[in-house]
UniProtKB/Swiss-Prot annotation:
Co-factor: note: Binds 1 zinc ion per subunit.
Keyword DNA damage assigned: yes
Stretches annotated zinc finger (FPG-type): 237-271
UniProt xrefs under PANTHER family: FORMAMIDOPYRIMIDINE-DNA GLYCOSYLASE
Protein's name in the database: Formamidopyrimidine-DNA glycosylase
Gene3D superfamilies: 1.10.8.50, MutM-like, N-terminal
GO molecular function: 8-oxo-7,8-dihydroguanine DNA N-glycosylase activity; class I DNA-(apurinic or apyrimidinic site) endonuclease activity; damaged DNA binding; DNA-(apurinic or apyrimidinic site) endonuclease activity; zinc ion binding
InterPro entries linked: DNA_glyclase/AP_lyase_DNA-bd, DNA_glyclase_Znf_dom_DNA_BS, Formamido-pyr_DNA_Glyclase, FPG_cat, MutM-like_N-ter, Ribosomal_uS13-like_H2TH, Znf_DNA_glyclase/AP_lyase, Znf_FPG/IleRS
UniProt organism field: Geobacter sulfurreducens (strain ATCC 51573 / DSM 12127 / PCA)
Its biological purpose: Involved in base excision repair of DNA damaged by oxidation or by mutagenic agents. Acts as a DNA glycosylase that recognizes and removes damaged bases. Has a preference for oxidized purines, such as 7,8-dihydro-8-oxoguanine (8-oxoG). Has AP (apurinic/apyrimidinic) lyase activity and introduces nicks in the DNA strand. Cleaves the DNA backbone by beta-delta elimination to generate a single-strand break at the site of the removed base with both 3'- and 5'-phosphates.
Keywords in alphabetical order: DNA damage, DNA repair, DNA-binding, Glycosidase, Hydrolase, Lyase, Metal-binding, Multifunctional enzyme, Zinc, Zinc-finger
Reaction catalysis annotation: Hydrolysis of DNA containing ring-opened 7-methylguanine residues, releasing 2,6-diamino-4-hydroxy-5-(N-methyl)formamidopyrimidine; 2'-deoxyribonucleotide-(2'-deoxyribose 5'-phosphate)-2'-deoxyribonucleotide-DNA = a 3'-end 2'-deoxyribonucleotide-(2,3-dehydro-2,3-deoxyribose 5'-phosphate)-DNA + a 5'-end 5'-phospho-2'-deoxyribonucleoside-DNA + H(+)
Amino acid sequence: MPELPEVETTLRGIAPHVTGRRVTAVTARAAKLRLPIPPELGERLTGRVIERVERRAKYLLLRCGDGTAIIHLGMTGTLRVAPAGSPPGKYDHLDLVLDDGRTLRFRDPRKFGLVLWTGSDPLAHPLLAQLGPEPFPPLFNGSYLFSRSRKRNAAIKLLLMDNRIVVGVGNIYANEALFRARIHPERAAGSLSEEDCATLATAVGDVLRDAIAEGDTTLHEFIATEVPSGYFRINPAVYGQTGKPCTVCGTPIARIRLGNRSTWFCPVCQK
């Protein structure tokens, strides 16, 4: 599933090619993804200029004057700018043809993504309104995490993955951030000190920024005719490293199930 760094890189990859471009035609080849594609989408978008592209959590927002297309990539979705005349593939469900002849193309083999339209503030849309802050300062920091974790017995890893607390911290990045902060994933969130929270908030931001920086090396792929694999080459310290030696102390990395998700940690370094 594309996580926040992949979505941010998608934004950076397509924005230079679509910003300021007018949509001249819309072709929807599927009536429904995770939710139905609005039947009026073509009418709403055709003739409008994409003024800017934004990201909120894992949603991409195509701002078009007084309306916005809201896009979520789901589990397997990608957005690419296809050359003029490039034929669609089997899983290419939506095309926005631009005034330079190229096409902003949404591909989604498993059809768990979504494309919606709103004529009001997209941040007030029910899908976005209850989301927590982005996982970076100034809104997400140690003080914020400390205040939101008080009197909570939930495991800190589960708190990090709660989009109402903070957005964009998927399983990979939660595991890696907790390792960097030396905090056990099962530890009760309410037991963290202010110093713990400050360290963890910094680790979350650092892990995600590192992944985004890796993604910046793939920006050329967003105008390729072939769809790349889409996931960045990361070198995780704990994620997926069951039994391998900890990079700090050499202890074998342990794996448990937490909240129905695989969780990895160092039994010695993380307390």
